[in-house]
């Protein structure tokens, strides 16, 4: 996605870089469908999923949402499912390990928020093989939400090199989660999930007290640790 930024201010409805093809930035093919889809957030704010305002949510809202959005369709060999918040911290850590140079705060923030759309757009992490069946309108909605995130956190566009590094870390995290969390076998990971990366044996994350390697964290723990990393990076990037 070619990311762009605007000078929209808090409280203004953000129309994003997606083409404004109809009233309320709703595509003509959506004629007759609702023009608002509100979500009431923990902070009391409201987010319109069809025309997201970049300042509608708080950082705490986002952390809570990601801690309650689950990988692997919510299934797990553990007592708890794996949250996207924990996955995001894993990918960021793996990118830091793989990078020849230290990630800038903006690059690290982009990694941390790479799946943030999932928390804001209904709290669903759609498994990859299902995505092509959701249609162009869902892709358009996701692009609008990503544009709102880009504006809110001033995220830089991916370069070819940084995106390749990100995808490598994301696939490595997926392979490792598949083995240690979802209980796929190494053979199934390569042949059925078609992930070529070899799963890690050592969990790259610093483990919270009382947690084992690869064990999914409780939502409160995942939200707290994600929020701490998010706010640390925001303070270093100068994002609002």
Region locations from a protein language model:
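Metal-dependent phosphohydrolase cores
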Residues: 2-240
């Amino acid at each position: 996605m070619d990311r762009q930024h605007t000078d929209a201010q808090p409280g203004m409805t953000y129309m994003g870089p997606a083409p404004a093809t109809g009233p309320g930035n709703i595509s003509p093919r959506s004629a007759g469908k609702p023009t608002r889809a509100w979500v009431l957030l923990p902070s009391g704010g409201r987010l319109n999923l069809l025309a997201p305002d970049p300042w509608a949510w708080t950082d705490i809202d986002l952390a809570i949402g990601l801690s309650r959005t689950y990988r692997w369709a919510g299934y797990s060999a553990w007592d708890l499912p794996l949250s996207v918040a924990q996955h995001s911290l894993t990918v960021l850590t793996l990118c830091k390990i793989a990078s020849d140079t230290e990630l800038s705060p903006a690059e690290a923030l982009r990694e941390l928020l790479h799946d943030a759309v999932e928390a804001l757009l209904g709290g669903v992490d759609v498994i990859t093989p299902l995505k092509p069946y959701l249609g162009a309108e869902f892709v358009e909605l996701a692009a609008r939400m990503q544009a709102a995130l880009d504006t809110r956190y001033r995220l830089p566009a991916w370069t070819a090199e940084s995106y390749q590094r990100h995808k490598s870390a994301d696939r490595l995290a997926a392979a490792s989660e598949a083995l240690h969390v979802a209980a796929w076998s190494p053979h199934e990971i390569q042949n059925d999930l078609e992930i070529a990366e070899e799963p890690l044996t050592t969990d790259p994350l610093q483990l919270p007290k009382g947690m084992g390697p690869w064990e999914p964290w409780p939502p409160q723990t995942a939200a707290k640790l994600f929020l701490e990393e998010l706010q640390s990076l925001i303070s270093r990037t100068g994002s609002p």
